[in-house]
């Protein structure tokens, strides 16, 4: 049986770090320690760890999305490339895409803060997430052998952040009515972001300005999407990925 381990670290009620692993019972202690070591340097005053058995049989897929690395001179050039990819994938007019991306860079919650989850945007350019503060979060996904995948990616010059991002966005793109994704971190000093489509994870540097504490995700979906089913799949369906899409 597989177990889901979720960790959330915060300070003064503000979210600092989070992570999830899906492992067999004999790997629980090791996974908890790994998640704790990731959160501890951020000096949280509260850490919550939740461990629960996964009742539903995980969907096992062969590989993650293929990685395409893009490096530009500045974040404006990077976002121009992101716009071109998103326009091709979604059909949404560039001006509306710019407005949506600007929201992520300035705070996409109604009060101008960062959303806790992702925006959901249909092909009409409409925001359709059920809660504009909470958004939607993708959970219950991991690589079958995470340590092996991390070693492969590090050898190619990537980081553990790439493992986490690639894992989440690969699950997202499994959903038939998910078209594309845009993501930047809310950490001020982390400027690499990504755009994903059905085939590729475009890792783009820099996708935001250094020092900007805003960030978030946009999930682009078809107009015909069943929102309740989409939420259930992303938040509850267990997915395990065997390999990573690099040469």
Swiss-Prot record:
Name the pathway.
Metabolic intermediate metabolism; pimeloyl-CoA biosynthesis; pimeloyl-CoA from pimelate: step 1/1
The record lists the lineage as: Bacteria, Pseudomonadati, Aquificota, Aquificia, Aquificales
Record-listed E.C. numbers: 6.2.1.14
What's its catalytic activity?
heptanedioate + ATP + CoA = 6-carboxyhexanoyl-CoA + AMP + diphosphate
Q: Which cofactor does it need?
A: Mg(2+)
- GO terms, molecular function: 6-carboxyhexanoate-CoA ligase activity; ATP binding; magnesium ion binding
UniProt keywords (A-Z) are: ATP-binding, Biotin biosynthesis, Ligase, Magnesium, Nucleotide-binding
> Any idea what this protein is called?
6-carboxyhexanoate--CoA ligase
Q: What domain of life?
A: Bacteria
Source organism: Persephonella marina (strain DSM 14350 / EX-H1)
